[in-house]
A protein has these predicted regions:
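N-terminal secretory signal peptides and thylakoid transit peptides that target proteins
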Residues: 2-20
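C-terminal segment of N-terminal export signals and the immediately downstream linker at the start
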Residues: 27-63
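Conserved Rossmann-like nucleotide-binding pocket used by diverse enzymes
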Residues: 56, 82, 108, 153, ...
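Active-site loop/oxyanion-hole signature of alpha/beta-hydrolase fold enzymes
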Residues: 62-63, 102, 109-155
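A short loop-to-beta-strand scaffold at the N-terminal edge of the catalytic core in hydrolase folds
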Residues: 63-71
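Conserved HGGG/HGGXW glycine-rich cap/lid loop of the alpha/beta-hydrolase fold
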Residues: 72-119
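Ligand-binding pocket scaffold of soluble enzyme catalytic domains
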Residues: 92, 124, 133-137, 161, ...
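Conserved hydrolase catalytic core segment
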Residues: 148-181
């Protein structure tokens, strides 16, 4: 299978799974609207088909890392954290994040260890790619951003990471979408 075909397949599976999970949340607005009307998005963010970048990239010190992440949507909206897999990065969610943001969700998409602008704070910190370590990184990110509870979504390594988070810290997980994990 070519890399391009594999990338498109993963994107389709991830977007479909997230769409299936989040579709019921938007159905109330559609069901209560009058025939012939289209409900307005919850925020001023308009999803762009074929987007190639995020509106903003940020950094925050969290646990043993300085984590780079994209954020979209209203600051006080319900939080969705999307976790990429290996060897992908946050741009796997560049088409999904604006859709969730337009539906009123605060979307946080972090670069995992070794990706993008995420770096270790100390050269002495052991390098570890286990999903349990990555789950602890996402928990530290939630603490740094003062997020008490979030809907967690991920694919590949990200799926395993959110599975671990839901198992070890269920009080921090509102819901979970795990694709290929």
């Amino acid at each position: 299978m070519s890399d391009e075909l594999d990338r498109k397949r993963r994107h389709f599976v991830g977007a479909t799974a997230l769409g299936m999970v989040f579709a019921p949340f938007g159905m109330n607005a559609i069901a209560s609207s009058k025939p012939g009307t289209v409900p307005a998005p919850a925020t001023g963010t308009t999803p762009l088909a074929g987007a190639t970048s995020f509106h903003s990239l940020k950094q925050v010190k969290a646990g043993v890392l300085d984590i780079g992440y994209a954020e979209d949507g209203p600051a006080r909206g319900p939080v969705v954290i999307l976790v990429h897999g290996w060897p992908y990065d946050i741009y796997s969610f560049v088409d999904v994040a604006p859709i969730l943001a337009a539906a009123g969700y605060r979307v946080v998409v972090p670069f995992l260890r070794g990706y993008g602008s995420t770096t270790f704070l100390s050269a002495d910190t052991p390098r570890n790619g286990q999903q349990a370590a990555i789950a602890a990184d996402i928990l530290a990110l939630m603490d740094a951003l003062k997020i008490k509870k979030a809907t967690l979504g991920g694919f590949d390594w990200g799926a395993r990471t959110v599975n671990i988070m839901a198992a070890l810290w269920p009080e921090r997980c509102k819901a979970m979408v795990s694709v290929s994990g």
